[in-house]
Amino acid sequence: MNISRSNSLSLKLTLLLTSTLTVMAGATIAPSLPGMEKHFSELGVANAELLVRLVLTFPALFIVIGSPIAGIIIDKFGRKPLLAASVLLYGLAGSSGSYLESLELILVGRALLGFAVAGVMTSATTLITDYFTGQARASFIGLQAAFMGFGGVLFLSLGGRLADLNWHAPFLIYLFAVSS
């Protein structure tokens, strides 16, 4: 382990900020669900109530499916390439609900978001274990958990504010990933 690399502020910030993405994946859009349900019900989409609920839960299903795949990708291509690709996919797939009008396509975007979260979670955690050992690792994982909790509160609150504008708006929060 290269001590100067593990003490790098940019490395620490990258790992902490990308860790906030995992928690915000599902809950950020929760405040927009009533507006989505109303919109798609008025359009006559069959089973709109059920499908809109799946918009919230789909990422979790695909995180479960994608996590072992992410581990295989890490072994083959490395941690940083997977993290970079996953963050990009996260921003694109997560924000898809801001411009898509098809509930089915939004569900596809949410599935892709789940795969992206799996990649972010797996690569960030693996990088933490690569760069930190002993007490430094334990402390950093504690800091990571704090960032995840803070991110969840911040992004859920922001999602609620944006949902007051329209149901598409909270999906824009996912573009934060591209800036991190």
What are these model-predicted stretches?
Residues 23, 27, 98, 114-122, ...:
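Small-residue-rich segments within alpha-helical transmembrane domains of MFS-like 12-TM solute carriers
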Residues 36-37, 73-74, 158-164:
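Interfacial helix-cap and linker-helix signal at transmembrane-aqueous boundaries
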Residues 11-45:
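Extracytoplasmic
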Residues 33-64:
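Extracellular/periplasmic helix-loop-helix junction of adjacent transmembrane segments
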Residues 27, 59-68, 152-153:
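Residue-level signature of mid-helix packing/kink "hotspots" within the transmembrane helices
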Residues 103, 109-148:
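Cytoplasmic helix-loop-helix junction between adjacent transmembrane helices
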Residues 135, 143-180:
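Helix-loop-helix hairpin linking two adjacent transmembrane segments in secondary transporters
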Residues 64-104:
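Conserved MFS/SLC helix-loop-helix module at the cytosolic interface between two early adjacent transmembrane helices
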